[in-house]
């Protein structure tokens, strides 16, 4: 059975903790009755309640004591409510804390704006030293969790709610800097996918158009700088698909890193959901759906696209 990103994280961390006694798990009122880590390692599981900032601060102390803490809470509460703690803990102290943030984007759907998070990449990408990942599918999530557990570096891992996705093929156990899921004519447009829904839409658009598709997992400045160089060696026109605000997202970062290339964005824009609905309905209301991606590819092919201004806000 294919697991969601959140469930794959919990399962992989539980497995790793059986061999590494320094791994500990903290949740902010999200553990539930059947958390696999709590069942397998009850003395290393802490449910701290609705106290996200305090949870991150606790994790910093555990890291200073030689442990490898993984903390998890909804993305809006991790990246926004606890932003100060993330800045001081992951940034200033460079503590080896991994934050796993489900409910990213608008995967919270009918829970509404309080449970949506379209700004987390902008916040975390501005904190130096934090490794940022947005895995797609179970295999990538497991690989990212394993890497974070080994590294001892601060991480922010972005995932959705309960949706499952078929993993992209991986050659080996390590994630490539750029996963070229499909490579076409270098003179044509290249889709660049970010996160779960950005990748789902890009896969569908690639199947419909035959353009190249490059998938990114690691989104911090260090990784994106290297990825941008690889992208530019193969293509010069990119449509970036991401479930994030235009400001501070990956498209804007790539536009700055690739000034000689054409970069346009298909994202969540600058609006707020005004009606309820499921995940995909809320995305569509914000302008993020397959027709929007296909339109962006078509416009770029015909020279009618609106590029992301390097040094300015994405449109």
Features from the language model and the residues they span:
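Thiamine diphosphate
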Residues: 1-145, 149-156, 160-315, ...
